[in-house]
């Protein structure tokens, strides 16, 4: 039985939640998000809270209710406050700059990499070695950050590469002769 599903999601002021059949739409100051709800979960919107109840007899219904509750909570937080992910470039000559809606990355390859940002994600480069991604969809922000990090993940010997701002890179000692 999911403990997560038992906690209702409160709807803050300025956020509008509508349920049409199995489609949940959340609109707020930062934008709007839509998600199709699993058939094993019943969603009830009343008195400024969203409750999630499993369908009787459905296999894994409590687990789906907990997952749905977490996803909807991320939608509500995203449209009201937004999400942000910071990346740091560590290495000699590693640079990032914004070119329109693209990020131009110099990561030690023989050519610069151009990463196109999807709709719903905005980027900012406060310095040449920092990237800040912002948006309303938490999953999309994490996906874009993982794609950029995937170009040059941090290596354990010198720590060079693209890393999340809060990431601790485990360092290894060089081989001794």
Swiss-Prot record:
Species, as recorded: Shewanella sp. (strain MR-4)
The family this protein is said to belong to: Belongs to the universal ribosomal protein uL6 family.
GO cellular component: cytosolic large ribosomal subunit
UniProt protein name: Large ribosomal subunit protein uL6
Protein task: This protein binds to the 23S rRNA, and is important in its secondary structure. It is located near the subunit interface in the base of the L7/L12 stalk, and near the tRNA binding site of the peptidyltransferase center.
Organism taxonomic ancestry: Bacteria, Pseudomonadati, Pseudomonadota, Gammaproteobacteria, Alteromonadales
A Pfam family the protein falls into: Ribosomal_L6
Record's keyword annotation contains Aminoacyl-tRNA synthetase: no
Region Disordered: start-end pairs: 152-177
Ribosomal protein listed as a keyword: yes
Record's keyword terms, sorted: Ribonucleoprotein, Ribosomal protein, RNA-binding, rRNA-binding
Oligomer status and interactors: Part of the 50S ribosomal subunit.
A GO molecular-function descriptor: structural constituent of ribosome
Gene Ontology biological process terms in this record: cytoplasmic translation
Basic and acidic residues composition bias: residue spans: 152-171
């Amino acid at each position: 039985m999911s403990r997560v599903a038992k906690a209702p999601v409160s709807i803050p002021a300025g956020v509008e939640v509508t349920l049409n059949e199995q489609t949940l739409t959340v609109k707020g100051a930062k934008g709007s998000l839509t998600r199709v709800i699993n058939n094993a979960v019943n969603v009830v919107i009343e008195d400024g809270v969203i409750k999630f109840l499993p369908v009787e007899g459905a296999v894994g219904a409590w687990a789906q209710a907990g997952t749905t509750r977490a996803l909807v909570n991320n939608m509500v937080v995203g449209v009201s406050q937004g999400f942000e992910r910071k990346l740091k470039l560590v290495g000699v000559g590693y640079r990032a700059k914004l070119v329109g809606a693209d990020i131009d990355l110099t990561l030690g390859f023989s050519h610069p990499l151009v990463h196109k940002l999807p709709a719903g994600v905005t980027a900012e480069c406060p310095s040449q070695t920092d990237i800040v991604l912002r948006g309303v969809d938490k999953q999309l922000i994490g996906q874009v950050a993982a794609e950029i990090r995937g170009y040059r993940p941090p290596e354990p010997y010198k720590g060079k590469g693209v890393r999340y701002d809060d990431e601790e890179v485990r360092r290894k000692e060089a081989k001794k002769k």
